[in-house]
Amino acid sequence: MLKGKVVLLGVTGGIAAYKAASLCSALVKTNATVEVVMTKNATEFIAPLTFEQLTGNKCLVDTFDRNFVHQVEHISLARRTDLVMIAPATANVCAKLAHGLADDMLTTTVLACKCPKLIAPAMNTGMWENPVTQDNLQTLRHYGWEVIAPDSGRLACGDVGAGKLPEPELLLEHIIRALAMPKDLAGKQVLVTAGATCEALDPVRFITNHSSGKMGFALAKAAMLRGAEVKVICGSTTVAPPPFVEVIKVQSAAQMFEAVREHSREADFVFKAAAVADYTPAEPAAEKMKKKDGALSIPLKRTEDILAWLGANRRPGQVLCGFSMETENVLENSKEKLKKKGVDMICANDLRQAGAGFGVDTNVITLITAEDVRQLPLMSKEAAANAILDRALILAGK
């Protein structure tokens, strides 16, 4: 994912320094080249040898080390670095970076870097909340740093509050968002619907479907990584939503319709990937229905057609994409849906095809527009999401 990218991982002298080893390992698994620079205080918490074994590269600590491969090591490293991540960052290092102090290998190197910079402060709650620290972080933001807020919880000193270094998995997501994708959706707003709706029969039971939300969340994550501001309206899902997107939770088709009406107008791209019930109980029971002998009939009524409403109420320039899950006559039914709903593209799925459908991590999609039909091969839902976004961008440029 990050092959060919050079990440400078700065590690400073806090108890959370041990988490930097897990982050370093995760970065190596993305095929990034990881260069670790430590402060001398950091070496009191974790040995440079740990990072050297993980990365295969020399861990830099001493500005005046005479064993450098390059004559001016901090400048050479700064030139080839694609992204800086300092995690954990002490209050001391935050202050030095905010005011341009360069008195060790880490601050000297980072001062020379012209690439994107991320910093994850970790410290005692009192130090974090100190106005001086907050002023320093605001200065860093002013100069283009992305400041990753600490988590709250029990700290090593025994206090409870803000100051914990976020888990390495979340820090990695920040790095991937900054580096992995072209930012061709920067400045755009994307709305995605995902998951299944649940239509109540009574306070206990409901009608739903097999949608996991994986395809919708893959679209949301891909759009986020490509620079978009993303909102996800989701029903029931079996997986967690991606980070850095706004999540709006709903249950029923009626709730999803109202949420779409509220949030769709501002979107540049709308992807309706949710599996929304076509019918809902006409009158859900107020109390739990009791089991009786014989058959049970439940009157149903049509739900609002969200995609048709979007097609009829779209604003000029908005790109609208729907999904079609079929078991027969896939192309014919999907082409008819494209025309009937007034959308730009239908992503058609054949439920009978191996590797496609609900709950799996792959998909086989046919992209249908007014101009052409494009059959995508079996691929991960993440890859399919990017293929859909590529096509949507072409449609936006028409």
Q: Residue locations for each model-derived region?
A:
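A cross-family phosphate/adenosyl-ligand binding-site feature
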Residues: 1-119, 124-398
